[in-house]
Amino acid sequence: MKKEKIDLFYGALLHDIGKVIQRATGERKKHALVGADWFDEIADNQVISDQIRYHMANYQSDKLGNDHLAYITYIADNIASGVDRRQSNEESDEDASAKIWDTYTNQADIFNVFGAQTDKRYFKPTVLNLKSKPNFASATYEPFSKGDYAAIATRIKNELAEFEFNQAQIDSLLNLFEAILSFVPSSTNSKEIADISLAEHSRLTAAFALAIYDYLEDKGRHNYKEDLFTKASAFYEEEAFLLASFDLSGIQDFIYNIATSGAAKQLKARSLYLDFMSEYIADSLLDKLGLNRANLLYVGGGHAYFVLANTEKTVETLVQFEKDFNQFLLANFQTRLYVAFGWGSFAAKDIMSELNSPESYRQIYQKASRMISEKKISRYDYRTLMLLNRGGKSSERECEICHSVENLVSYHDQKVCDICRGLYQFSKEIAHDHFIITENEGLPIGPNACLKGVAFEKLSQESFSRVYVKNDYKAGTIKATHVFVGDYQCDEIHKYAALSKNEDGLGIKRLAVVRLDVDDLGAAFMAGFSRQGNGQYSTLSRSATFSRSMSLFFKVYINQFASDKKLSIIYAGGDDVFAIGSWQDIIAFTVELRQNFIKWTNGKLTLSAGIGLFADKTPISLMAHQTGELEEAAKGNEKDSISLFSSDYTFKFDRFITNVYDDKLEQIRYFFNHQDERGKNFIYKLIELLRNYESEEKMNVARLAYYLTRLEELTDKDERDKFKQFKKLFFKWYTNNESDRKEAELALLLYVYEIRKD
């Protein structure tokens, strides 16, 4: 990036820093002035300072040249906010302050205006600590204090004490803002909804500022005052922007369709590798466009969204980048992986809440989505197809892991391809928190780029172009790009079946796999904010906040839900999960994850899950396939469901948790834990009766009465009162309805698995 764009980025990102200082000190003057004065104390950069000081329409200066960057920051702020702020007051205005400003309000939940129902939930005033418990929104209103803001202001000032405001430190400041300002509301106007954080608004303002700069530069227009201030309403009509997106296809097959007993060791490495590939695709594209991560709205699960300038150069760069990266994928993965880019132009009016319609907002995303879909149908041009066909069938053996026939080598007594050999090495590095991009050392991740995990203390010894850090914010000297990764791992995959046994050696020796994802997330993303207020809440800032909320839940907090459980998170995208572990802990994890997800989204979104039960030597590909079928069975049950072990045991989530997991299973444990082996053997007879109820209903009721009487005789005298309660309860389950019988059958089966001795 050239110096002018770097200054523009910092000015746009810091334009509202005065709000933090103003709330900390209570100063009664424009936040733009407060922010600029504060900045001048810590840095010597007049261009950045002027953007902070003059980014408000009612505080422009005749001293500014027509080509001053402050005009770009001004209109970018308006677009990011979704309103034209020429007529707005602010917190320091004496007349308006008492009436409309709630200076210390805490941030509202993004899901308050999501879906059809309006809610009032708020976040606790805090920083974003990735190691602490999730900051769940609640109905409790707990405002900030001056002291809270003073602590935030002090931390920012301390972090920026040695800051150079150059290109190398851009990611550091983005990290700092996300860590400190994610629960600080951008607007405290009581007539607005304070659900957009200052971190998100500042980031989006910087994104639009950089895109506007490129757009006007391309057209040779440098009278920013005229174009962006005097004639701002005309600029809002110009299709100055592109919403660009990419989709990386083949992720599921790449991770799960692997053979051999040693493949399990690669499983997490393959997943993490593709996570970083998506990150690298995004960063590489931004580098080529002379942009940074402010322009990246979202990345995760093989998808990403960007705000870019609508110029021929941008489109040419997208086309060439897509071509080059697919050449890399073809050379290393043949047709197993493919990346498709899509984009669509839009004007500021299409995303500004006072000017847009829900339909125009959806169309922005649909343009990009349609282009991607068309490319995925027809992936390769004629020349590429001819080259692929000319290769014919290789005479070499297949890679014993991924079945590739290209570039095979011998490694650990196996015939493997170069990529799988690299993944073996990478699997030893995934415990590190830092991952570097080098030119030629490590696992190929893009054209002339390799990925390598490195211990923190050895970073200074390495040569790299970029460093990523997992689940941690690093500002200052490290200059790292943080990435969210769901990577909890208790033990090696092959050990989980044995770990299903308790300390007494009881429990069926099986592992379990869960696959789950959010129901109808695509529709929710495009239209979730359109159902209230005639679509006025459909804004880019809310879409970006929504996406980051999903990433935070599924890539960070998921590690906490898994902690202390015997399982490994293999894959956690922005909305879907694949995990392997002891079968008891996989069920417990799924229940905990689902209940926390309902709490996180206030019940506005649901998820569906399939859980499969397998012997420890079952091929990964088979486990993934069969569990995927169970997930589909859950989706087929009108979603918000779980399918456990077999599609026969498919329940609505609430029904499974309330009636089976927390009730019937507990009742069965309470009684049968006091029975000897003879008593426990009757469980199989009870299961058989439940399964055969329809065949001979009257006869089976009589058999049940007989079995329960025999079971009572085997029960110790001091336990018989307890048994009578169970007898009455079970008879009710059996005779009540099919739902109760199916729930009782699964509860008994789960208990049998808990007490098996094999």
UniProtKB/Swiss-Prot annotation:
Cofactor details (free text): Degradation of ssDNA requires Mn(2+), Co(2+) or Ni(2+); Mg(2+), Ca(2+) or Zn(2+) do not activate ssDNase activity. Formation of cOA requires Mn(2+), Co(2+) or Zn(2+), Mg(2+) is not as efficient.
Superkingdom to which the source organism belongs: Bacteria
Pfam families tied to this protein: Cas10-Cmr2_palm2, Cmr2_hel_dom2, Csm1_B, HD
EC number: 3.1.-.-, 2.7.7.-
Reactions it catalyzes: 6 ATP = cyclic hexaadenylate + 6 diphosphate
Region (HD domain): 1-82
UniProt miscellaneous comment: Encoded in a type III-A CRISPR locus.
Domain notes: The N-terminal HD domain has ssDNase activity. The C-terminal GGDEF domain has the cOA synthesis activity.
Protein function: CRISPR (clustered regularly interspaced short palindromic repeat) is an adaptive immune system that provides protection against mobile genetic elements (viruses, transposable elements and conjugative plasmids). CRISPR clusters contain spacers, sequences complementary to antecedent mobile elements, and target invading nucleic acids. CRISPR clusters are transcribed and processed into CRISPR RNA (crRNA).
Name listed for the protein in its UniProt record: CRISPR system single-strand-specific deoxyribonuclease Cas10/Csm1 (subtype III-A)
The organism of origin for this protein: Streptococcus thermophilus
